[in-house]
Amino acid sequence: MIGIYFSGTGNTKYCLEKFVALYDRNIEITPLEDEGTIEKVAHHKDIIFAYPIYYSNLPKIVQDFICGNSDVWKGKHIFIIATMGLFSGDGAGVSARLFKRYGAHIWGGLHLKMPDCICDVKALKRTPDQNKQIVIQAEECIKSAVYNLKNGTPTKNGLSFWCHIAGLLGQRLWFYRKTQAYSDKIQINWYVL
């Protein structure tokens, strides 16, 4: 088994590390952007795949990684961990549908609310104490999910038809243009620094 992750702020990496520490400390974890990651994936049948959700969508780097390596997913068993700031509906389901298209079996899914890095949306702003509570709650969810997985009843957050509808109607359609404006052209306002 191997753990693969993308983590913009460190939240997702933290969650995967906690999950692996409770499930099996011998599992190697590696960021999907590392050069040798896809070769490592090819040598493992079971995968824990973790990423953040942006407005109920996959980060472009995650979608590109899954689609760009479509031939490697056939026959893999994948457990998905999706981190989010508030709500995603089908955060795990977004990648699950891609993985299934490429022949993977989805083992389960786990949604974890974590402190958000988006500072221009009032609903996502939290005090440091609130953020600590969010992390504690996420750790409890991880413990529960690991217990369920070890007992043969994996958590299936975000994988149902109704979760898909909730993600689509609750966020993706409303915020579609938010992520379309993202660019690879970095702009730094030095006067702000």
Where are these regions (language model features)?
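Cysteine-centered iron-sulfur cluster-binding motifs in ferredoxin-type domains/subunits
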Residues: I186-L193
